[in-house]
Amino acid sequence: MRKVINSGVRLPIIDYNKSQPDQCWSRHWLPKREGTHAVGRTGGSIDQAGANMNKTMYPLKFKPILKTVVWGGEKIAPYKEVVTDQHNIGESWELSGVKGHESVIANGEFEGRTITELVEQFKGKLVGEKVYANTGNEFPLLIKFIDAKSDLSIQVHPDDELAAKRHNSKGKTEMWYVVGADEGAHLLSGLSEKITPEEYVKRVENNTITDVLTNFNVKAGDVFFLPAGRIHAIGTGCFIAEIQQTSDITYRIYDYGRLGLDGKPRELHTELAKDAIDYNVYPEYKTNYTEKKDDENVLVECKYFTTSQYDLDKPFTKDLSGIDSFLVVMCIEGRGSLTDHEDEDHTLTLHQGETVLIPATSKGVTFTPSSGMKLITSYIG
């Protein structure tokens, strides 16, 4: 399934979503879609900007957008404590500004409005002045939970330059945090040996492309940074939190010959991917970090996002006064509460599987675990 961008180039739209080694740092070496449902009420008034411009921003929760896909499993709904009759849910889009798939606020006076409407209304007050100057009314990050009951397609994402040239769009840099892993769970990230573009095409044609990809057995807590151009695939048994640029461009390289939900083979983008792939081999693809209890553990810092992990048994306060950006908080385990220092009344309960957006106007936030709580936070800057 593909859509037409105003540049006239047909844009691949696929099941899953990478970006540029020299643009990002992590703790390793670097040089309407089928099966989509929003949980809960949607809609709400759009024409409220004038009346609400002076209203106070507050921590926002969202209605998850659940995606049924051919490789999806049954873990997301119970993990998030949501009730749905959907099956084979492969993704929960926690926070999305992707056109046509925008997240809807689930709490407070802005309930029922979309994230795009709020960005248009509050601009830098919501996302940060520098962020808004660079990205405009499109919320710049796409936040997901992913449940792989079977292997995802092998794929790659174009960088900003190529995406702009072909699709009048942004590229896609992303990262994975492994929330949970079944026995034998694995994923693919990066080339294991140097190949040429011509050899890449031959290996796709003769079904041997996986022979030159780096395979990782994974466990909870593992982190992978995926710059645009890096071939990758999530494997069977992985449950992952994904942070990425707001972009829905994916080039599917290899799909194991399987059929899609419509009973037909899913489209491949062999030639488009040929020019998007980074053919370099790197000494390390997995991010190494030291986990400190009750403290901030920085996982990735790059121009697109800075992501940290917290494993808390006691309250922790994150100072946001020096950050000209929003803060996205994903609760990946346990439960507790979140208090915005801008208004002590803005204390939210937070449980496993929930995602909260802290506005850029906040000067700080305190995370208070009930009986242990693990968080992933992301901001730009």
Describe each model-derived feature in a short phrase:
Residues 317-318, 334-339, 355:
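Short beta-strand segments in beta-sandwich/barrel cores
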Residues 143-144, 152, 174-177, 215-216, ...:
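His/acidic/aromatic-lined binding-pocket segments of jelly-roll/cupin-type domains
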Residues 2-195, 255-284, 307:
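Transition-metal
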Residues 194-206, 325-337:
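Short, basic/aromatic beta-hairpin or loop at an interaction surface
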Residues 136-138, 146-151, 160, 170, ...:
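Ligand-binding loop in jelly-roll beta-barrel domains
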